Amino acid sequence: MTRDIQTMAVKDVKKVVLAYSGGLDTSVILRWLQTTYNCEVVTFTADLGQGEELEPARRKAEMFGVKEIFVDDLRETFVKDFVFPMFRANAVYEGQYLLGTSIARPLIAQRQIEIAELTGADAVAHGATGKGNDQVRFELSYYALKPDVKVIAPWREWDLTSRTKLLEFAEANQIPIAKDKRGEAPFSVDANLLHSSSEGKLLEDPAEEPDEIVYQRTISPEAAPDKATIITIDFEHGDPVAIDGIRLSPATLLAKLNELGKANGIGRLDLVENRFVGMKSRGVYETPGGTILLVAHRGIESITLDREAAHLKDSLMPRYAELIYNGFWFSPERRMLQAAIDESQKSVTGRVRLKLYKGNTIVIGRESPNSLYSLKHVTFEDDQGAYDQVDAQGFIKLQSLRLRLAAIAGRRGGSL
C-alpha cells in the first residue's frame, strides 16, 4: 500500500512523532505507520482552542496501543507568540484571508520537534495531503528547527489517493468515522482559537453556495440581533490587552472576541485562494474574533502611527503575509520583517471603541496618550495660528514641479 520509490526504508525509522488530531485522516495514518513502518508511534495532539474535547484523541491513540501520548494545551502560546505578532502586521493574504490555518502550523511543528528530542524519536509525520499548503508549512518548519530530521508524509507515499479509499481503509481497520449532523462524512475541517476552515464535498464547486450547516462558529448576519453591540478594546504596544476595560490573557481575550463576533454574525469568508503549490482552492473560513481585532488594530494605528511609517508598514504587509501563508515563519526574512513591524508598534497604545452589527465591525472612536491627531491643526474653526494655510501654496508648487517640467517638454500624462 505504498509507492515504493517515495517511501523511506522501513528499517530507517524506529520511532516517529505524529501530529495527531484524532480525526479520520490522522487515525488512518497512525494505523498505517504501525503496519507499514513497523515502528513505535508517539502521538502529539495540540490544544489550540479548536473547541472540541481532546480526550477522545487520547483514547483513540490508546486503542491503537500507543504508549507515549502527548496532549498539550498551547492556547496561550499560540495567541501570544504567533497570532498577536501576526496581527501587529495586519497580515492578510490576497486581501481577504486572515491566515488562521497557516499561523498554527509552525507552532505544531515546533512542539513536534521538541517531543521528538524528548522521546528519542528519529522521525516526524503529519497528515497533510500532497496537494495542499500544509505539507510545505510543516516540513519547512521541521527542517528549520532540526535540519537532519526524517519526515514521513503518508499522503505522498500510500495508495489511499482519495477520501473514498480512506474511508474504506478506516472501515477495514475498525477506525471510528465521525458523521456530521446529517449522518454523512464531514467536511475537511481545521479549527483553532483564531478560526475554522471547511473544505471538500460541495465546496469543491466554487459556483455552489455553502449550506448553513457548513458554518460552525458564526450565526448568519441575517440572524444576528437587530441591536448593535458596543465594545472597547485596549492596546499596549500593538497587542490587545483588555475588552471593556477588563484585562484578559491573550487566549481568553481572543476567545471573548470570538463569542462577540459569533453573536453578531461577524467573520464569515467564502474564498478561492492561490495555493503555494500552484492550484486554486475554495474554502469557507470563519474568523469572528480575528476580524474584530484587525479592524480595531487598524483603528488604533490610525492615530498613533506616523504617515510614512504606516505606509511603509502597509507596503511590507503582503510580503509578510505571503511568508506565513507559504510556511516561512522560521525564516530570516520573516524575523527581519517582524523586527521592523514590532518597532513600529512601540507607540500603538490606546483604546478603540467598536460597534458590532450584523456582520459589520465599525470603529466609532479611538483615543491614545500617543495620538498624533491634532485637533487645533485640523479644525474647520479658528485654529488660532496653529497652521498657516498660505504655506500650502509653496508645498503644492514644489510638488508640481516635475509635472510642470514634463508638460513643458511635451510629455503630458494624459490628453486634454
Curated annotation (Swiss-Prot):
**Annotated Pfam families:** Arginosuc_syn_C, Arginosuc_synth
- List ligand-binding residues for ATP: A19, Y20, S21, G22, G23, L24, D25, T26, S27, A46, G127
Cellular component terms, GO, for this chain's entry? cytoplasm
Name the chemical reaction catalysed here. L-citrulline + L-aspartate + ATP = 2-(N(omega)-L-arginino)succinate + AMP + diphosphate + H(+)
Report the GO molecular function annotations: argininosuccinate synthase activity; ATP binding
Q: Which organism is it from?
A: Granulibacter bethesdensis (strain ATCC BAA-1260 / CGDNIH1)
Q: What is its EC number?
A: 6.3.4.5
- What does the entry list as the binding residues for L-aspartate? T129, N133, D134
Q: What is the designated name of this protein?
A: Argininosuccinate synthase
